[in-house]
Design a protein with these regions (language model features):
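Flexible phosphate-sensing "switch/lid" loops adjacent to ATP/NTP-binding sites
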Residues: 1-319, 326, 343, 367, ...
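Catalytic nucleophile serine of serine hydrolases
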Residues: 331-332
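A Zn2+-metalloprotease active-site environment signal
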Residues: 335
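A conserved active-site-flanking secondary-structure segment within enzyme catalytic domains
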Residues: 338-390
């Protein structure tokens, strides 16, 4: 029998749609449902490569893990990776079809609906429930023509909708009631309930507020979910993680907060480790005296390299390396550490830029993107992180540029680089690095075990906060 859909929409970006969908995936899995996530179109710089070499958004990877499934590109058939404020690289079913301006994509997206529906139907044939995530708000009225991700998709699938609002940012009545009021009658009929998300304090104090929401919107409030902090990947660019500025206790890790920073989930193992603090640095005044400098991945290597130079951070990084402070580049950050980055075909912004000159390599962007999972053993390193020699790793690569043949991790003195995202996730990698920098010994817990424990905790919290029985009735009967 074909899967039944349920859709999570939100009043705005960062209302909590992604984690709500993940929580519902795990809660339904616990009850024996075969469940899969689906988001027709995702805009994100954080992405992932599946085992068969396709690129997709990390939010759907998190939801797939919560559902107990392997990541499948059909769960996110369209991924937009911003390259500028008005343009993105467009990825369809895991492969790039080129860069487009917002205007070009708006005209192009109507062609994508057949591919989106084919992906959805394939998942629906293999599962009992599909948990669909919308994007942004369903009432961006100027963008609703040819909608493929919110109510346009919900109507096509006759999917019941749960609408999530973020009370932490204020205006919950305007958010939820305003959104419901701006929907068409047909769209409004699909909304089966409201969820108040990120409530701080005693939830019982909102009981009267919930009644007011129901009276004003005509929709039942199916739950008030408390504000929580769990160790689960959060891909949204508004993530609070990026706001960390001050030095904490223990080993001080300074990650450069690049304008087009991607895959910042790479650094979660350092964030969760005791005896280590991670801060995200975007200006010289924040640089301080770190024990480790990390240049992260980016969707626009040359432009972000120019950002480091124009603001003076490049000088700080080079000076730190000359003082013996370890510097570690990942993917685009790795490319920046070399002598030169060239983009002759305009894959990102075009042109070329001198690198920081800390590693003996040059990067040239070709037309083909490298997308692959990878695993192996680290070897051949010298210096402070020679402790990683013999350490097994698994991860994935997503990059346009090629920098010649080299090992998974390379170094020159105290400067290190890798193309492998997720390399710090394996038990022992981050712990050994922290210990090498004089930090307290960290637990060698594998990141995957941490995730599994947190998915269970997420489902427990969700069940305690919502009317799960009513949600199941909505899924089963659409009421």
């Amino acid at each position: 029998m074909k899967a039944r859909p349920i859709m999570i929409q939100g009043t705005m970006s960062n209302a909590g749609k992604s984690l709500t969908a993940a929580a519902l995936c795990r809660a339904l899995k616990q009850e024996g449902y075969r469940v899969a996530p689906f988001k027709s179109q995702n805009m994100a710089l954080n992405s992932y490569v599946t085992k068969d070499g396709f690129e997709m958004g990390r939010a759907q990877v998190v939801q797939a893990e919560a559902a107990g499934k392997e990541a499948d590109v059909r769960m996110n058939p369209v991924l937009l990776k911003p390259t500028t404020d008005v343009g993105s690289q467009v990825i369809v079913l895991g492969k790039s079809v080129g860069n487009m301006s917002a205007r070009e994509y708006f005209a192009y997206k109507k062609q994508l609906f057949p591919a989106i529906m084919e992906a959805y139907e394939g998942l629906a044939a293999e599962n009992d429930v599909i948990v669909i995530e919308g994007a942004g708000s369903p009432v961006e009225l100027n963008l609703n023509d040819n909608d493929i991700v919110n109510m346009g998709l919900a109507e096509k699938l006759s999917a019941p909708v749960l609408l999530v609002g973020d009370i932490d940012r204020g205006g919950i009545f305007a958010q939820l009631c305003g959104t419901v009021s701006l929907l068409s009658d047909r769209e409004r009929a699909l909304v089966k309930g409201l969820l108040v998300n990120k409530f701080r304090g005693d939830v019982s104090l909102f009981a009267e507020g919930a009644k007011m929401l129901e009276r004003l919107s005509g929709k039942p409030v199916l739950g008030v979910v408390p504000y929580f902090s769990l160790d689960i990947d959060d891909e949204d660019s508004l993530s609070e993680r990026l706001s960390a500025k001050g030095r904490g206790e223990g080993v001080d890790v300074a990650v450069m907060r690049l304008p087009k920073l991607s895959n910042f989930t790479d650094f979660a193992p350092f964030e969760r480790a005791k005896g280590c603090s991670v801060r995200y640095v975007s200006r010289v005044s924040e640089f301080g005296a770190p024990d480790l400098v990390i240049l992260p991945g980016t969707k626009s290597t040359i432009e972000d390299l120019r950002f480091l130079k124009s603001g003076g951070l490049a000088e700080q990084i080079v000076a730190a390396a000359h003082r013996g402070v370890p510097v570690f580049g990942v993917c685009g950050g790795f490319q920046m550490l070399g002598k030169k980055v060239s983009d002759p075909f305009g894959c990102e912004c075009g042109g070329e830029e001198a690198g920081l000159g800390l590693l003996p390599l040059e990067t040239v962007f070709g037309r083909e993107k490298c997308l692959r999972e990878t695993q192996g053993t680290i070897g051949g390193l010298s210096g402070v992180f020679s402790c990683l020699n013999g350490q097994n790793y698994t991860g994935y690569e997503i990059h346009m540029g090629q920098s010649g043949e080299h090992a998974a991790v390379v170094n020159s003195g105290c400067v290190y680089g890798t193309y492998v995202h997720g390399i710090f996730d394996d038990a022992g990698v981050a712990a050994k690095m922290i210990a090498a920098l004089g930090g307290a010994p960290a637990e060698n817990e594998d990141a995957r075990a941490v995730k599994e424990r947190n998915y269970e905790e997420l489902a427990k919290l969700f069940r305690a906060s919502v009317d799960m029985q009513k949600i199941k009735e909505i899924i089963e009967h659409g009421i």
